[in-house]
Amino acid sequence: MSIRERLLATVSRYIAAYNEFDPSAMKTVRTVSCLTHGIAPTCKFTQSVEEHTKHMMLSRGVFRSVNASIVDDGTTVVDEGSRKVVVKVKLRCETIVGPYENEAMFIMAMDEEGTLVDGIFQFLDTACFRQFQGRLEEAHVSRD
């Protein structure tokens, strides 16, 4: 298998684990030192594997199902030398406040073998995310 094929296979395994929305599944495709970075101006964060696990556990109370898929529109970029892949991702989720859809760009850095994710940079469409946050806040206020 070429390095390009390995990198793309790792991205596919990551997306499959993401769809399980299970921290244990996510850990199987990430290095122990993997960091997740939110890089949108209004949604900046950096999380270790353990911090990401805690975030996922809290989010399970909001998200009932998660479906992420790679948008195959020619935007995928594979840099074999740096072991990085850039993919456009479509997110469709069922949540406690109804459907949530968004698009994101994931920049994924892999380990030397190209089989584990060593860093993830996520750029979400923040307008969609803010609308979703507003719906969550409205639901929370109406419960109080």
Curated annotation (Swiss-Prot):
<comment type="pathway">
    <text>Secondary metabolite biosynthesis; terpenoid biosynthesis.</text>
</comment>
<comment type="function">
    <text>May play a possible function as a regulator.</text>
</comment>
<comment type="similarity">
    <text>Belongs to the trt14 isomerase family.</text>
</comment>
<comment type="subunit">
    <text>Homodimer.</text>
</comment>
<comment type="function">
    <text>Part of the gene cluster that mediates the biosynthesis of calidodehydroaustin, a fungal meroterpenoid. The first step of the pathway is the synthesis of 3,5-dimethylorsellinic acid by the polyketide synthase ausA. 3,5-dimethylorsellinic acid is then prenylated by the polyprenyl transferase ausN. Further epoxidation by the FAD-dependent monooxygenase ausM and cyclization by the probable terpene cyclase ausL lead to the formation of protoaustinoid A.</text>
</comment>
<protein>
    <recommendedName>
        <fullName>Austinoid biosynthesis cluster protein S</fullName>
    </recommendedName>
</protein>
<dbReference type="InterPro" id="IPR050977">
    <property type="entry name" value="Fungal_Meroterpenoid_Isomerase"/>
</dbReference>
<dbReference type="GO" id="GO:0016114">
    <property type="term" value="P:terpenoid biosynthetic process"/>
</dbReference>
